[in-house]
């Protein structure tokens, strides 16, 4: 009897983690909040605006078992209609003890995930914006590594007088450059965790 288990909905699932405290408090992925909190641009690049100019967002969380999650983002406007931001999002899973099948210690190893982001947003009208994110992705688990490239495409509608906002975003469209090598040397490439919100 052969048993095979498959879990998850794509490689690099850390891309779906919230990057800031407010984002986590709003359920993890709010794509409509149009204010000066630059961290929401990680979820929807169309949320960049004149309000995020020269803002810096720094976030760090120490989870259980020394799992560290962090992000940094900086916003810059290049005109009254063109907004950009650059950021990094990482997860450090800590140091693990490597043992063999009879519990002899062989050493230690680490595991880390990271995405570097470049975001651009264009003001289409007084109420509509469109944004795109490009994110090279890197992952290192013990001696296995993988890299990829992901893109997000987002739209935002905001009417401050009516106190109404809406968003639409397609996240994590892309591919792996190289997959994690298996024990027999296969290099299987997997899909990214594509998400339409």
Region annotations inferred by a language model:
Residues 38-50:
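N-terminal periplasmic accessory domains that precede
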Residues 58-61:
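Short beta-strand segments that buttress and anchor functional surface loops
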Residues 63-65:
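A short, glycine/small-residue-rich beta-strand->loop->alpha-helix junction that serves as a flexible
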Residues 4-27, 31-37, 53, 69-197:
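Outer-membrane beta-barrel porins/channels
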């Amino acid at each position: 009897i052969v048993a095979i288990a498959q879990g998850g909905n794509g490689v690099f699932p850390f891309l779906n983690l919230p990057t800031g405290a407010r984002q986590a408090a709003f359920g993890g992925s709010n794509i409509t909040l149009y204010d000066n909190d630059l961290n929401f641009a990680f979820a929807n690049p169309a949320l960049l605006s004149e309000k995020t100019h020269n803002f810096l967002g720094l976030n760090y969380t120490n989870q259980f078992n020394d799992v560290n999650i962090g992000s940094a983002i900086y916003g810059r406007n290049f005109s009254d209609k063109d907004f950009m931001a650059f950021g990094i999002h990482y997860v450090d899973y800590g140091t693990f003890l490597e043992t063999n099948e009879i519990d002899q210690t062989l050493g230690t190893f680490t595991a880390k995930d990271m995405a570097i982001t470049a975001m651009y947003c264009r003001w289409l009208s007084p109420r509509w914006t469109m944004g795109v994110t490009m994110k090279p992705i890197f992952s290192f688990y013990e001696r296995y590594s993988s890299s990829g490239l992901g893109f997000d495409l987002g739209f935002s509608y905001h009417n401050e007088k009516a106190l109404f906002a809406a968003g639409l975003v397609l996240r994590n469209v892309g591919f792996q450059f190289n997959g994690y090598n298996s024990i027999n040397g296969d290099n299987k490439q997997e899909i990214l965790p594509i998400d339409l919100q």
